[in-house]
Each structure stands twice: as C-alpha cells, then as structure tokens.
Amino acid sequence: GQNNHDWKRRSPVMMDTLQATGRFHIERAIVTKEEIANFKPDFGKYDVVLSNYNGEPWLEETQRSFVKYMKEGGNLVVVHAADNSFPNWQEYNEMIGLGGWKGRNEKDGPYVYWKEGKIVRDESKGRGGSHGRPLEYKVVVREKKHPITRGLPTEFLMVKEELYDRL
C-alpha cells in the first residue's frame, strides 16, 4: 500500500507470474499509512516474504517479529525500491545487504563495489544511493553456487532496468 513506484500495477503482475507456475500459494498484504499501526502479521505462516514496500516504518513489535522470523529460517525477497524502505532499521539493512536512499551516507557503512576482480569497501564521505534512467546492462554472476544465483547463466543482459550505484 506504499511505494514511490507503481506498486498498484507491478504487484499484481508479480503475483500472477508466481501463481501461473502452480508452485505458490500467495497472500497479499496492502498496508496504507493509516493502517500501519495494525500491521502485525504472523510471519511464521509463510515460507517467504516478497516485499514491494517502501513506506512508513513498521511498529517495533512488527520489526521484532520479522527479525525473529528471519533468524528462524524465514526467507525474504526484496523488490526494487523495497531496499529503501527502512533506512534506520539496522537488522533490515543487514538482511538486504545494501540499501540506499532516504539520506544514506558514509555513516551507514562503506560504499561496496567490484574492482579488478576484488570487492572494495570504500570509506569515502558522501551521500549514497542513486540510479540513472533505465538502461540495458550486463549482469555477471560471480558466485554460481549461491542459492540466489544458482542456475543463472554466468552472464546475461538485464533489459531496461535502473542500475543502482553509490551503495
């Protein structure tokens, strides 16, 4: 129920795509600003949470419940701007690895990038999180055995997507 991108159009497309496989039972939660105080799902009922959310912070009770779910083996898929949703929630940002926007700067951690075959952690000062216009770019899979990338080709073309930078 909250995002700076067109969630009303994109969320149903994701749902339809997943349901068409016949492998998923899907429940959808739409939470408006007015309803956030009552958003207290039982995350333990789900094998995976797919988030297309970028809105008001969750209640601390809901955050604790979600952290517990993840520590007990829960799974999370963060879609596009959902990496921006909770800039001040440390555990969430640890779950997603790198987030951006909403005032992120060097105090939130180093910039992390790949240079000459190595991961670089750059402590330079400055704001973080941006992207240009959607474009095609090559994705190179460096960890082929990781559960997220297992089965993907070594290289593939990402078609018309925003390439995040300064993370």
Model feature map: region roles:
Residues 10-12, 39-40, 134-138, 166-167:
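A broad, low-specificity signal for short, low-complexity segments enriched in glycine/proline
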Residues 56-150:
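A glycine-rich, often tryptophan-bearing local segment used as a flexible ligand/cofactor-contacting loop or short
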Residues 140-167:
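ATP/pyrophosphate-binding catalytic subdomain of soluble kinases
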Residues 3-86:
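Helical hinge/lid and interdomain linker segments adjacent to catalytic or ligand-binding clefts
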